[in-house]
């Protein structure tokens, strides 16, 4: 009799474990399916916004990067990529080999797009579009975004920076001096700095991880009750930052407010044909929709152990 009772208890425990595992598996499958559906929706929206490949930062390079990295079949067709590359060459030809003297961040993002379509950054119709990123003083003067994307471009494409440590230290100093991780209006600069520094999080000699953790704590305090960071773009950027650190934006406890994750926050800006940037808007916003696609794509890649800003091997 006792053996029978004991056996029944064991069976009950095993069944409970199986149900729990099955329930967890079901939740994961549902989350993965939802992410796939949302990514496909964002791809469709971006293709409507940017039907032709072009060099423009809005509706241009970001669209190309999101479409290529999304993994959605035929998201960025050969023709789309050719149109983008042709536009890059036209711009270089008309401006004596310079993409944009006043906006190095735009140049860096365009270079990422060029690399993703398999072209040589050091020979785009005879022009080297990586030269500017190696000029630390010019990059630094253009602000923290230019420094962040210089680091991203270097790590993603193999472009060697003359003194990488100077870029890293300047970025940390800039974010700390302005306390941008505590200021909602300037938080995007700190968020993108995290993306740039994510490749160096084990660099204890210059306290990268300690600073990133401090910024993450400050940014977490800026998160709103709906899970967002106050705008679609900021929410998307925060998702990309988390995934660049290998963290899951759905389950990361530091960024869950009132049961709402950053993923929930992002979807709160979704409309019938794209994304708005703020809750009061009615018309689809180009930048918000592009950044939403990039964020969703980064989440898909994070589950595969990959970053948004890296070349898949």
Please provide the spans of the model-predicted regions.
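Preference for long, amphipathic alpha-helical scaffolds in soluble/luminal domains
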Residues: 2, 26-313
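Sec-dependent N-terminal signal peptides of Gram-positive bacterial secreted proteins and lipoproteins
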Residues: 7-28
């Amino acid at each position: 009799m006792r053996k029978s009772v004991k056996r029944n208890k064991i069976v009950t425990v095993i069944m409970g474990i199986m149900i729990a595992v099955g329930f967890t598996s079901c939740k994961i499958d549902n989350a993965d399916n939802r992410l796939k559906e949302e990514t496909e929706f964002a791809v469709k929206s971006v293709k409507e916004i940017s039907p032709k490949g072009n060099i423009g930062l809005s509706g241009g390079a970001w669209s190309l990067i999101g479409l290529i990295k999304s993994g959605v079949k035929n998201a960025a067709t050969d023709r789309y990529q050719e149109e983008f590359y042709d536009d890059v060459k036209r711009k270089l030809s008309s401006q004596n080999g310079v993409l944009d003297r006043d906006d190095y961040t735009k140049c860096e993002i365009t270079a990422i797009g060029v690399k993703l379509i398999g072209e040589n950054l050091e020979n785009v119709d005879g022009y080297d579009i990586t030269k500017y990123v190696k000029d630390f003083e010019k990059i630094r003067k253009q602000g923290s975004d230019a420094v962040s994307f210089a680091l991203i471009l270097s790590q993603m494409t193999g472009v060697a920076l003359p003194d990488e440590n100077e870029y890293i230290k300047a970025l940390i100093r800039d974010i700390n001096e302005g306390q941008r991780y505590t200021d909602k209006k300037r938080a995007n600069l700190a968020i993108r700095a995290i993306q740039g520094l994510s490749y160096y999080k084990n660099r204890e000699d210059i306290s990268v991880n300690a600073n990133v953790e401090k910024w993450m704590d400050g940014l977490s305090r800026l998160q709103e009750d709906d899970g967002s960071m106050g705008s679609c773009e900021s929410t998307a950027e925060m998702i990309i930052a988390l995934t660049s650190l290998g963290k899951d934006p759905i389950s990361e406890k530091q960024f869950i407010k009132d049961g709402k994750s950053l993923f929930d926050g992002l979807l709160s800006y979704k409309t019938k044909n794209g994304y708005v940037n703020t809750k009061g808007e009615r018309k689809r916003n180009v930048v918000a929709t592009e950044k939403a696609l990039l964020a969703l794509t980064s989440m898909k890649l994070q589950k595969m152990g990959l970053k948004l800003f890296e070349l898949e091997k």
